[in-house]
Amino acid sequence: MARYIGPKLKLSRREGTDLFLKSGVRAIDSKCKIDTAPGQHGARKARLSDYGVQLREKQKVRRIYGVLEKQFRNYYRDAARQKGNTGENLLQLLEGRLDNVVYRMGFGATRAESRQLVSHKAIMVNGRVVNIPSFQVSPEDVVCVREKAKKQARIKASLEVAGQREKPTWVEVDTAKMEGAFKRLPERSDLSADINEQLIVELYSK
């Protein structure tokens, strides 16, 4: 399955919440009716079954992190094998993706842009170029923008936008050096309360 390249606002409207697929600090509900699904009949809301609710939650999280269906299922399997809460393990695996860490550090305005930076070899981990967006970053790893990419206007613009957002506590960033440290895995309380990972666990447990 190919990645979705259509209108980003349409995906957020489909899920009824801001998926943070657009750059900027202004909430997208100020731009469009976020609680109304796209399309001619978007205002009609059918009552979802339990399965439908679980499926929507899975799709929402998958779209937030820009992960394809097969990848997402593999993440769930890995999370289920680990000790502890499967849902929290899943979120930590998604948060540990290099493209997501680049986004959290502010080098990319969106996860999609951060994925592109990684793919274009603009990012280094512990002094080595890594061009795999799904690369798992470990605690204490140092992530930085490659020297020849530091002049890119989009990276500078992203850091300015990131400066206006609430900073994640599990990463530490030196904006001047365009370098950051992944201090620890985020705890559940660090992440969005809008995500109900238990619904995803229930979906895949069937």
From Swiss-Prot:
The keyword RNA-binding applies. Keywords: Ribonucleoprotein, Ribosomal protein, RNA-binding, rRNA-binding. GO terms for molecular function: rRNA binding; structural constituent of ribosome. One of its GO terms (biological process) is ribosomal small subunit biogenesis. Coiled coil: none annotated. One of its GO terms (cellular component) is small ribosomal subunit. PROSITE patterns: RIBOSOMAL_S4 (PS00632), S4 (PS50889). CDD domains: S4. Residues 96-156 form the S4 RNA-binding domain. It comes from the Bacteria. Transmembrane segments: none annotated. Gene3D superfamilies: Ribosomal Protein S4 Delta 41, Chain A, domain 1, RNA-binding S4 domain. Belongs to the universal ribosomal protein uS4 family. One of the primary rRNA binding proteins, it binds directly to 16S rRNA where it nucleates assembly of the body of the 30S subunit. Part of the 30S ribosomal subunit. Contacts protein S5. The interaction surface between S4 and S5 is involved in control of translational fidelity. NCBIfam families: PRK05327.1 (NF003717), rpsD_bact (TIGR01017). This is Small ribosomal subunit protein uS4. It comes from Aeromonas salmonicida (strain A449). The lineage of its organism: Bacteria, Pseudomonadati, Pseudomonadota, Gammaproteobacteria, Aeromonadales.
